[in-house]
């Protein structure tokens, strides 16, 4: 789905299902230079198991507009604002690669949103991919 947020359109994959009132949310976070497509099979599985899925393309990634964010902190803050705009109160967060760092930063900066964390192929530090920043200039 396209969600207008902070003057850009954000692409949010939902696993092929509309959100249902009262269902738990699962937020899938892609890595640097990636998109919601990272989570195609997983998002559909959880959606068909009854979860509300949010797999956003970060600004400047995939099908989302805008310019790439330049820090993990900015990504977590942006994500918290997006979730607030969508009316999400808590969620399980699943991150891959740089998405792990965003999930961890969410737990640190915006812990009220974080019910569970699943971190796949993360690292202690992953810089924002410079070609993304350069490409948006």
Regions inferred by a protein language model and the residue ranges of each:
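Active-site loop/oxyanion-hole signature of alpha/beta-hydrolase fold enzymes
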Residues: 2-9, 13-15, 43, 48, ...
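Serine-hydrolase catalytic-loop signature spanning alpha/beta hydrolases and amidase-signature enzymes
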Residues: 33-41, 53
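Proline/glycine-enriched tight loop/beta-turn segments at coil->beta junctions
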Residues: 17-25, 51
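Active-site glycine-rich loops that stabilize anionic/oxyanionic intermediates
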Residues: 23, 31-34, 97
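Conserved catalytic-core motifs of eukaryotic protein kinase domains, centered on the activation segment
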Residues: 38-40, 64-69, 128-131
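Alpha/beta-hydrolase active-site loop signature
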Residues: 33, 58-62, 124
